[in-house]
Amino acid sequence: MTEFDTIAAISTPMGEGAIAIVRLSGDEAVEIADRLFRSPTGKQLKDVPSHTIHYGHIVDPKSGRIVEEVMVSVMRAPKTFTREDVVEINCHGGFVSVNRVLQLVLANGARLAEPGEFTKRAFLNGRIDLSQAEAVIDLIRAKTDRAMNVALQQMEGRLSKLIRELRQTILETLAHVEVNIDYPEYDDVEEMTPRLLKEKAEYVRGQIEKLLSTATQGKILREGLATVIIGRPNVGKSSLLNALAHENRAIVTDIPGTTRDVIEEYVNVRGVPLRLIDTAGIRETEDIVERIGVERSRQMLKKADLILLVLNYHEPLTEEDERLFAMTEGMDVIVIVNKTDLPQNIDIERVKELAAGRPIVATSLLCERGIDELEKAIADLFFGGELEAGDLTYVSNSRHIALLEQAKKAIEDALSGIDVGMPVDLVQIDLRRAWELLGEIVGDTVHESLIDQLFAQFCLGK
């Protein structure tokens, strides 16, 4: 275990609540807590068993004044999250009391933790690897049950296990090559022929490709689908956002141009997180404020993963409608024909022609009809209706995906070398490169600056 000083931070969100927790970790965690904790029975925390909780008060050692009534948990190394001694002081929720306790802890020998430092220590002390540490962030930020399940799988080490198995295969192959090169006279060691080397490399490439095949779905679950709602003014875009969000998030009126800016909302559609973006109606306008909103809408359109194009069932198609179809050509689009509670004036055959095989859903948002069909269309478009079975390991982190792509390229370079008859000692350079890249995923071959950058994304106290 690495030697560190003792750190402390508030581990619960600030604000009013039932409890707030000050967490300490390090060799002096119990000693510092003992300076402040007073039990009604007079017992000291250094004498209590590990993984126990105790009632008492936090007392200012200088004045002897009671600061807070608390429950204190004592957990001794190595069976803790950081593999260090950990103390958690459970205070009443609120701003004042928990900050008073934290200030006393800091005044008595602890240092204020940096963002993510508790998890960083868990990594540096070998409690978790880097991919598991990153999964902690994903778990905190998960917007749906399925996104949370993917994060939990990664925290449990499912991805780590696969990566380590691939690294071990490469390492054994490299060792075999080295033995053949250094000790060619050993007849009892199987020769690493180009055919055998190719089999090993192709196996590793196949496993990497299998992981990468989950990347699109994994990133959607982790980051959400950037879903932009577009359409002429007053076709029901804001009503659609409200319907999917199941609340009145956007203003709905009969006045065209009510939405003058971009409104964002996270919604859960059948386990798929959507970052739903309601845009200002795209049209030519003299209103300066609305014009700015329209320009922002155009910019959001370029970054969208999914576009919900809303039309008015009660009105004929216009040049603006047709222009929107042209703007979204080649993109993932679901066409929504809204206001079907009113008489039909739209040319549905022309809509089908413009949609060019893309899904069309009829809705009456006013009457709450068609929402289920729309949600199914979204799930069908990206996940074939349902996510894969729970035993599939998803790759959802952009850093992991990039490293897997690079490792695959290194393996392919090795295979190309084998095909052209390159000596095996040169082929192993590419194999070693793949081994190192895979090691960066779990943190075995990662630079310290990257570690600092990754853990800086965490909140204080985690």
Curated annotation (Swiss-Prot):
It comes from Geobacillus thermodenitrificans (strain NG80-2). It is found in: Cytoplasm. This is tRNA modification GTPase MnmE. K(+) binds at N234, T253, I255, T258. (6S)-5-formyl-5,6,7,8-tetrahydrofolate binds at R23, E88, R127, K462. Binds 1 potassium ion per subunit. Residues 224-383 form the TrmE-type G domain. Its EC number is 3.6.-.-. The gene is mnmE. Exhibits a very high intrinsic GTPase hydrolysis rate. Involved in the addition of a carboxymethylaminomethyl (cmnm) group at the wobble position (U34) of certain tRNAs, forming tRNA-cmnm(5)s(2)U34. NCBIfam families: mnmE_trmE_thdF, PRK05291.1-3, small_GTP. Belongs to the TRAFAC class TrmE-Era-EngA-EngB-Septin-like GTPase superfamily. TrmE GTPase family. One of its GO terms (cellular component) is cytosol. CDD domains: trmE, TrmE_N. InterPro entries: G_TrmE, GTP-bd, GTP-bd_TrmE_N, GTPase_MnmE, MnmE_dom2, MnmE_helical, P-loop_NTPase, Small_GTP-bd. Mg(2+) binds at S238, T259. GTP binds at residues 234-239, 253-259, 278-281.
